[in-house]
Regions:
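Core AdoMet radical
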Residues: 1-17, 29-46, 58-78, 85-117, ...
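Alpha-helical packing segments of well-folded alpha/beta enzyme cores
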Residues: 21-24, 51, 115-118, 149
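N-terminal cationic-hydrophobic initiation segments that often serve targeting/anchoring roles
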Residues: 26, 56-59, 84, 123-126, ...
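Distinct, well-ordered alpha-helical segments
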Residues: 49-53, 76-84, 145-147
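Catalytic cores of alpha/beta
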Residues: 141-154
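PAPS-dependent sulfotransferase catalytic core
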Residues: 170-181
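Single conserved hydrophobic/aromatic residue that forms the stacking wall/gate
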Residues: 182-192
């Protein structure tokens, strides 16, 4: 976002390998208001941390907010401790679409306990200038586990927002027969 206007630029190349991309972004620093880093996994792109450090050195960080979507498989401790505190606001949204073995299936070779440990470290830095959320994209693979997921996230202490998968349509929950979906909203009853 520059001067109140959201900018969409033609993709120059895969950012990690494109010097032109980083030069273009650096030229925009004086007017930047917001940076949005989304997946793949933005914490694996070292150049973006270099960019943030340049912004801090230019004394522009206090005017810029940052948003991340991450899968919680990486823990950027240096940024947590030394870079992000300089920025106006940082929000990190963890893309978590399942628990335990469901997470590991979707994010192979990631390990659930590692992701939970990483999110726990992030929670230590939660503040008015640093906010955490879990984005749970609901699809045909995880909709039946939604109550369990919401219970876990409430206990874990990071707010969740639900995102409905739209594409591909055959993974959208609207393809599930109505009678099957009813079971999701019914509380579990003991056998009597």
């Amino acid at each position: 976002k520059i001067d109140g206007t959201i900018q969409n630029y033609e993709r120059l190349d895969w950012p990690e390998k494109s010097e032109a991309f980083w030069q273009t972004v650096e030229s925009l620093i004086p007017n930047l208001e917001h940076l949005d880093f989304t997946g793949g996994e933005p914490f694996m792109i070292a150049q973006h941390f270099d960019l943030l450090e340049k912004i801090v050195k230019m004394d522009k960080a206090k005017d810029i907010s940052i948003h991340y979507n991450t899968n919680a498989t990486q823990l950027p401790l240096h940024a947590l401790k030394n870079i992000w505190p300089h920025f106006k606001y940082v929000d990190v949204h963890f893309s978590i679409d399942g628990l335990g073995k469901h997470f590991e299936y979707q994010r192979h070779p990631a390990k659930w306990q590692d992701a939970v440990a990483n999110m726990s470290v992030f929670k230590e830095y939660n503040s008015r200038k640093f906010d955490l959320r879990i984005c749970h994209t609901v699809d045909i693979f995880n909709v039946f586990y939604l109550p369990e997921f919401l219970d876990w996230s409430s206990e874990f202490g990071i707010p969740v927002y639900l995102n409905n998968l739209h594409e591909p349509k055959y993974y959208n929950v609207s393809t599930i027969p109505y009678l099957s979906l009813i079971h999701i909203s019914e509380p579990t009853r003991p056998n009597t």
